[in-house]
């Protein structure tokens, strides 16, 4: 009989307590809250430090260990098809909701009175983003540069090529594959150590957010925030819930299964902070390593459902607030531009805002200076974006794994039914689904 873990040792409980204390401290002692920003930044940097090698090990191990290379192409094709369909639905839902609710109507903002200097950096970066530029940026100048910069797509591309090459070596490459598997264990053990600091990181990030922006300053733009949060919630429950139901599992049970990762994202506002744990969690759920290694990292650029909702809502909100007319032609143009622009949202720093700036510039009809209207609340909306993105990628992994018949359905059912035990040891699993021992 297993002994139940004490409540105070649960990462889930620790992060909830840390976020609550951070909110209270930021509200009552804002200067102290702002000063705690390095705690959140430091935690996110620690996570980012090991993301590139973990993706490399997971993808290479998954691809090189597969029997047939055809299955890799099949998995990638199905994943991209799923990403395109679901993210397009997210864009359309955001567009419909903002047109029905009209959160910016009646503000009558004069564009000439806005402080455009506050968004100049975002606008300049956005103007440089092109489809061709984005595609070329996927190819790293050097392998070392891809890992040094922590560019997920560049690391992913090299990892896929490396995995294919290692697979072609057959038994000759087996010692190298074993070494990569052992190196992965070291990386996941580092993650285990870093995750013990998650409550501290969440505390510092939340204290800074509330201390810097306050709660009272949100009243004027609270309507847009409320609409966005409700839309994201409905998208998860209705759209993603419908997809889950059609594939034989519950989105609510899946959310319960990844609750610790969701709380980490809530505290840090960075979905990247949960990426290493998501790789381990989805594999433990029953998805094959090769599927998890392709779908999760790729989804961080191509399956950003929360960001897609945000982009259409924010763009039309700016038009409404500045009394800029947007007829059906303008809105279709906006949608078509975002279908391309949103796919590179994770490839740049300050991604959501830069992609939004690029979109406003490309459409031409909307004032880029209008970004100043939502600059102050963007940080508060980032939590909903990140949470929706994370749930979306979890659903995508299960669905794609089912499509390519690389999902252990019995394991999926049992893990979701049990709610998933806390991920004490975030290491990759062996073929039997049992965490392997440390390398000796």
Curated annotation (Swiss-Prot):
The keyword Zinc does not apply. The chain crosses the membrane at residues 15-35, 46-66, 78-98, 146-166, 190-210, 224-244, 291-311, 332-352, 354-374. Residues 421-440 are annotated as: Disordered. One of its GO terms (cellular component) is plasma membrane. Keywords: Cell inner membrane, Cell membrane, Membrane, Symport, Transmembrane, Transmembrane helix, Transport. The keyword Iron-sulfur does not apply. Its main location: membrane. It is found in: Cell inner membrane. SUPFAM superfamilies: Proton glutamate symport protein. GO terms for biological process: L-aspartate transmembrane transport. InterPro entries: C4_dicarb_transport, Na-dicarboxylate_symporter, Na-dicarboxylate_symporter_CS, Na:dicarbo_symporter_sf. It is a multi-pass membrane protein. GO terms for molecular function: fumarate transmembrane transporter activity; malate:proton symporter activity; succinate transmembrane transporter activity. It comes from the Bacteria. Gene3D superfamilies: Sodium:dicarboxylate symporter. Responsible for the transport of dicarboxylates such as succinate, fumarate, and malate from the periplasm across the membrane. Belongs to the dicarboxylate/amino acid:cation symporter (DAACS) (TC 2.A.23) family. This is C4-dicarboxylate transport protein. It comes from Pseudomonas putida (strain GB-1).
């Amino acid at each position: 009989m297993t002994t139940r873990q004490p409540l105070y040792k649960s990462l889930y409980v620790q992060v909830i307590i840390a976020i609550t204390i951070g909110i209270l401290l930021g509200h009552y002692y804002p200067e102290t809250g702002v000063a705690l920003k390095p705690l959140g930044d430091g935690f996110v940097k620690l996570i980012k430090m090991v993301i590139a090698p973990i993706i490399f090990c997971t993808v290479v191990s998954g691809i090189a260990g597969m029997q047939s290379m055809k299955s890799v192409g099949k998995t990638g094709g199905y994943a991209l098809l799923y990403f395109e369909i679901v993210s397009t639905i997210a864009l359309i839902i955001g567009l419909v909701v903002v047109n029905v609710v009209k959160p910016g109507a009646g503000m009558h903002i004069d564009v000439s009175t806005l402080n455009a200097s506050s968004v100049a950096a975002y606008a300049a970066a956005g103007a440089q983003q092109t489809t061709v530029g984005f595609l070329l940026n996927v190819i790293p100048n050097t392998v070392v540069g891809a890992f040094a910069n922590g560019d997920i797509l560049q690391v992913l591309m090299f990892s896929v090529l490396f995995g294919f090459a290692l697979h072609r070596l057959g038994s000759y490459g087996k010692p190298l594959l074993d070494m990569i598997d052992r190196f992965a264990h070291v990386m996941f053990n580092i993650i285990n150590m870093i995750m013990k600091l998650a409550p501290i990181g969440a505390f510092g990030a939340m204290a800074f957010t509330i201390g810097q922006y306050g709660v009272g300053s949100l009243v004027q733009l609270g309507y847009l925030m409320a609409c966005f949060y409700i839309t994201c919630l409905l998208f998860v429950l209705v759209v993603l819930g419908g997809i889950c139901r059609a594939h034989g599992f519950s989105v609510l049970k899946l959310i319960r299964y990844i609750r610790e990762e969701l709380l980490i994202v809530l505290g840090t506002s960075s979905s990247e902070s949960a990426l290493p744990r998501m790789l381990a969690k989805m594999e433990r759920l029953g998805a094959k390593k090769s599927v998890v290694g392709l779908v999760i990292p790729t989804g961080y650029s191509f399956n950003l459902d929360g960001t897609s909702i945000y982009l259409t809502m924010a763009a039309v909100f700016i038009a409404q607030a500045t009394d800029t007319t947007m007829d059906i032609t303008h809105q279709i143009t906006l949608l078509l531009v975002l279908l391309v622009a949103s796919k590179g949202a994770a490839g740049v720093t300050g991604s959501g805002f830069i992609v939004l700036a690029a979109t406003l510039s490309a459409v031409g009809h909307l004032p880029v200076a209008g970004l100043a209207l939502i600059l102050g609340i963007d940080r508060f909306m980032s939590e909903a974006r990140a949470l929706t993105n994370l749930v979306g990628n979890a659903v995508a992994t299960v669905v794609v794994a089912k499509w390519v018949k690389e999902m252990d359905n019995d394991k999926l059912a049992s893990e979701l039914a049990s709610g998933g035990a806390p991920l004490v040891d975030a290491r990759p699993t062996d073929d039997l689904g049992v965490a392997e021992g440390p390398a000796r």
